[in-house]
A protein has these predicted regions:
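Conserved N-proximal alpha/beta basic substrate-recognition cap immediately N-terminal to
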Residues: 10-17, 29-129
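ATP-dependent carboxylate activation and anion-phosphoryl transfer catalytic cores
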Residues: 232-301
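Extreme N-terminal starter segment of soluble prokaryotic enzymes
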Residues: 1-4
Length: 301
């Protein structure tokens, strides 16, 4: 097989949200990519993908950049593939996957904790019924596009909602939970199906990624099992994999992460599909780094 080339383009979420191939990311985002280009080494792992180029994430801006650098367009994703990625990067896809889960358990939150609102009045009704809420734009990046609301919309909140509705046609409105742990299931999608790659355990602040915990899959599963029954976690994983297989195989090739939340209620509960990222994640980098370090230790001993 031809040697694969990995590209670390963390500005991907901003590019996919904008959608324009001529979009120029903010200097801070492009600067972060340049300063941390060595992280591309930790994107590498055995995979079943057919493409020679494997980026953090595919978007029109990256495709145009590569073509301008002389890459043959024939080895890059088609316009239809890029549109599929953008459509399924919207938060509505996570809600759709959640609603199709056949996993009924008292410690697994159902999909009705959030709605896809198409008007400010819908948003206000949800907040009135549920109190504190989280507002999310369908497409956003790096913690942007997320607002936390208590009891009612401020003028600033309402203005943000109107702008988001005008630009992206909807706003995701969620009940706000007390978060105990944040984790993710990592997968690889290829032409033969979807493989489970591993778990990720991470922390965020105000919706923006903060850090990952380096640990084995077994240790992370043990930590999660301290709150949620292990069999429930495994059933959820297989259900998520089944639904993603139906939705993605044949249309998307690459890695993806399904973010999950363990929340405090009468007893700990699992939000099984909080976000879906059709790209690589920092959790995958952490998984690769841990697994590679473990391999080196075994080789030395």
């Amino acid at each position: 097989m031809t040697k694969q080339i990995y590209i670390f383009n963390p500005e991907h979420d901003l590019c996919i949200a904008n959608g324009d191939e001529n979009f120029v990311p903010p200097r801070s985002a492009s600067g972060f990519a340049r300063e941390n280009r060595d992280l591309s080494e930790y994107l590498k792992r055995p995979n079943k993908q057919s493409r020679q180029i494997i980026p953090w994430g595919w978007n029109p801006s990256l495709k145009k950049r590569l073509i301008n650098e002389g890459v043959d367009p024939a080895i890059l994703p088609s316009e239809d593939e890029l549109q599929f990625i953008r459509t399924h990067s919207r938060r509505e896809f996570a809600l759709d996957v959640h609603s199709r889960l056949n996993c009924v358990h008292p410690q697994v939150i159902g999909p009705d904790y959030r709605i896809v609102a198409s008007s400010v009045s819908e948003i206000e009704e949800f907040i009135s019924a549920n109190g504190s809420a989280v507002l999310k734009s369908p497409l956003s990046g790096s913690g942007k596009g997320i607002r936390f609301v208590r009891e009612s919309l401020t003028e600033s909140d309402a203005g943000w909602c109107r702008r988001t509705l005008n630009k992206q046609s909807s706003v995701i409105v969620e009940r706000r939970f007390e978060i105990i742990k944040e984790c993710a299931m990592l997968f690889e999608c290829h032409h033969e199906g979807i493989d489970f790659v591993g778990y990720s355990l991470f922390e965020s602040r105000n919706g923006a990624y903060s850090k990952n915990i380096l640990a084995s899959n077994e240790d992370i599963e043990e930590i999660i099992a301290g709150y949620i029954p292990r069999e429930t976690l495994i059933t959820t994983r297989e259900e998520v994999k089944r639904i993603l297989t139906d939705a993605l195989v044949g249309h998307y090739e690459g890695f993806l992460g399904v973010d999950q939340i363990i929340c405090q209620a009468a007893s700990p509960v699992l939000v099984p599909v909080s976000e879906i990222n059709l790209r690589m994640t920092m959790g995958l980098i952490a998984r690769n780094q841990y697994d590679r370090s473990l391999l080196l230790i075994h080789e030395e001993t």
